[in-house]
Amino acid sequence: VGPLHGLPISLKDNFKIKGKDSTVGFTSLVDKPADYNATLVDMLEKLGAVRYCKTNVPTAMMIAESVNNVFGRTVNPLNRKLTSGGSSGGESALIAFRGSPLGIGTDIGGSLRIPAACTGIFTLRPSHGRFTTQGCQSGLTGQEAVQSVNGPMGTTLEDITMYSKAIVDAKPWLVDPKMLPIPWREVESKEKLKIAVLWNDGVCSPTPPVTRALRQTVDKLKKAGHEVVDWDPKLHPLALDFLVSVQYDSGQNIH
């Protein structure tokens, strides 16, 4: 019996489970079952969670939708003509469809946040060193410079908080040396927050419905008493160049 006792939790395909495939969309990994559990899988079992399914991803988990040559395409349960996002799009679709009360995805550049936005659910993209990804199947084996993180996906903020506290209270730093030994802390939110809004990233112009949604959000935040400032993306290209230099083979783009 633990804090997650009896709770069904779905897992993104890259979480290795002994005896099961973790293809992450590669046909070359079909029928090559794992011979051990990912560390988080063992932790969830000790906390009482019930694992019952793994969910779809794009090949190598590197695009913002979920389609591959093993399981096909995952679509949005709210509108099957739209994507459920990626790379944790199998999780977002299942949770939005109420097929899973809580799921675990992973994220480097938006793989939790994009699917959650596409399907209207909640997620947390934590800092590195909080939730262990030890023993997971990588889509970019050997790439250690920019680390993936994992986080919960659910239909309420209370679910996200409950899961996060349970994992941190389980002291993951005792089983994964990359985890930071920082206990759970209750923090009172400030009544007034300063929030930045990105109207345009300097690369892709948002469509009118996205801009309208941003304006509506800004109006509601201001009415709630928060300070909203515009975010200038002028340094984003520099950050992207740095990312390419440390993440990709030879630090180069090849076209």
Residue ranges and their predicted role:
Residues V1, A166-H255:
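Amidase signature
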Residues N37, I121, T211-R215:
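Amphipathic alpha-helical segments in well-structured domains
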Residues T59-M61, S111-L112, S205, L238:
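Generic structural signal for helix capping and beta-alpha/helix-loop junctions
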Residues E65, F71, E91-K192, A196, ...:
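Fold-level recognition of mixed alpha/beta catalytic cores in primary-metabolism enzymes, strongest
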Residues T74-S88, H128-S138, Q252-H255:
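Short, basic, helix/turn surface patches
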